[in-house]
């Protein structure tokens, strides 16, 4: 007990805030390891997983953690404002639910699309369909939901340009994989700036309907849509194409080099 008290006395205000947030929510012991922010010097955490994996809850918990422990402005961007409001903010796994569970005082201004916390943090909620609305902001971080469904990839550019405050501004991306140019670029980064978490729907079976999972396995198991939407696989081949990327890379496909 003495050692524990000594440890508690050494906690900084920021560490106290983080500990309190985790203890109040119950997320720390229940969330899977892959749902917790990874260590490292990354700028983008790309969560590329199947439906029902727990992307929304992960994005909400991570953003609330950041807003509590590092006061500042944060962004939440989804394909449309309705998606951001109904899923990321007001949904059962959304930000409001997480804030209420943690007993964190907040004010959600629905008309402005803005959540204000008592510590001064602001969470700006908006749409990827309006990229110019992200000009002029100075964000510490943000959450980008369903990046694979964004119709305006320049929204990502504007958000990256606006995320520039703090020692390490970071963006968390939660999306079901689609072979867009932007997602393929992020997955292909080799400089350590992007940390990729992959996962399948089945990893969250404890929180999903067994009957629904059985039906999904039966109907979509082994199919192209199942590989993308359930297994979380980024499919780079074009359906119906004469050749696939895997065939090009197969042993014996390429001609041997001349001596």
Give the predicted meaning of each segment.
Residues 1-44:
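Pre-P-loop entry segment of helicase/translocase ATPase cores
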Residues 45-48, 75:
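Short hydrophobic/aromatic beta-strand immediately N-terminal to the Walker A/P-loop
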Residues 56-71:
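Walker A/P-loop NTP-binding motif
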Residues 72-84:
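Conserved RecA-like ASCE P-loop NTPase motor core of nucleic-acid helicases/translocases
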Residues 82-140, 234:
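Inter-Walker segment of RecA-like/P-loop motor cores
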Residues 145-147:
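Walker B catalytic acidic pair
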Residues 149-221:
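ASCE P-loop NTPase helicase motor core
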Residues 205-259:
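ATPase catalytic-site recognition across NTP-hydrolyzing enzymes
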């Amino acid at each position: 007990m003495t050692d524990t008290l000594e440890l508690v006395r050494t906690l900084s205000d920021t560490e106290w805030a983080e500990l309190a947030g985790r203890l109040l929510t119950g997320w720390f012991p229940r969330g899977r390891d892959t749902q917790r922010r990874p260590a490292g010097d990354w700028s983008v955490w790309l969560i590329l997983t199947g439906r029902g994996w727990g992307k929304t809850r992960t994005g909400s918990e991570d953003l609330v953690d950041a807003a509590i422990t590092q006061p500042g402005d944060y962004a939440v961007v989804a394909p449309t404002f309705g998606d951001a409001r109904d899923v990321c903010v007001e949904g059962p796994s959304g930000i409001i639910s997480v804030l209420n569970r943690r007993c964190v005082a907040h004010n959600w201004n629905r008309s402005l699309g803005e959540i204000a916390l008592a510590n001064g943090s602001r969470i700006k909620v908006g749409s990827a369909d309006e990229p110019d609305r992200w000009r002029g902001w100075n964000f510490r971080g943000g959450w980008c939901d369903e990046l694979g469904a964004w119709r305006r990839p320049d929204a990502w550019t504007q958000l990256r340009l606006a995320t520039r405050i703090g020692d390490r501004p970071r963006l968390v991306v939660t999306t079901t994989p689609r072979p867009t140019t932007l997602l393929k670029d992020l997955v292909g980064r080799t400089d350590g700036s992007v940390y990729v978490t992959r996962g399948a729907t089945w990893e969250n079976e404890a929180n999903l309907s067994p009957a629904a999972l059985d039906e999904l396995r039966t109907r979509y198991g082994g199919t192209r849509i199942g590989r993308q939407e359930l297994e979380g696989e980024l499919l780079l081949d074009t359906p119906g194409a004469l050749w696939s990327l895997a065939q090009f890379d197969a042993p014996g496909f390429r001609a041997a080099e001349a001596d």
